[in-house]
Amino acid sequence: MNANPYARPRRGRGLVGEFLVVMLGVLVALALEQGLSDWQEARRADDTLLAMHEEMRDFAVVLRLRQATSPCVVQRLQELDDHLSGADSLPAIEAIGRTPYLFSSRSGWRGGAPELLSRHRGPRQAQVYGEIYQGMEEFALLAQQEQANWARLQTLQEAEGAVDAPRRWRLREEIAGARNANLLLTAIADQMLQRLASMDVDVDSAPLPVDMRERAVCQPMSRVEG
């Protein structure tokens, strides 16, 4: 006869208790692991934002340089337009110059940055940064295309002599292309600098790498004396 009829149920409750303790330990370990993973990912999001703000500060220098260059471009293109309105035989130009073309890194938005920022800073903030980097890409592409206009205009430096009607027309097309590019790039620069400043990006402290007053495009245009 069993003197302790409750022994088996107590043993069963003990096993259940041990199981619950083990499960609780597993859940706590998983929660800690997930918490650590989330913390590490949040740190990566912070580091990504810091890197992106550094790239945007560098890009602000490019935008400010465009603002400084724009008046010189307007003046030079008008001088070239007037030059092509002259006689059939045109003197060569000593130095036409061109707009500066600077590079800035845009790698911060590549890879997993969009998804990372969306998770830890919200979809709206990720969208804002995406729009900024898209604007940076478009600005760089347009600036590169503008260089082709100026390269063809610099052929007026090569030699004096007759410039036939077809060539004059082509050069006037290049002037129009360079003028439109400058208008667009300057407008983009103005808008993006305002937007970057609204995002607490330091857009003013870094000095410009080029003194435009010393560049040929900002100097009075002179003709080669024969």
How would you label these PLM feature ranges?
Residues 1-13, 34-226:
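Long, hydrophobic alpha-helical segments that serve as membrane-spanning/inserting helices
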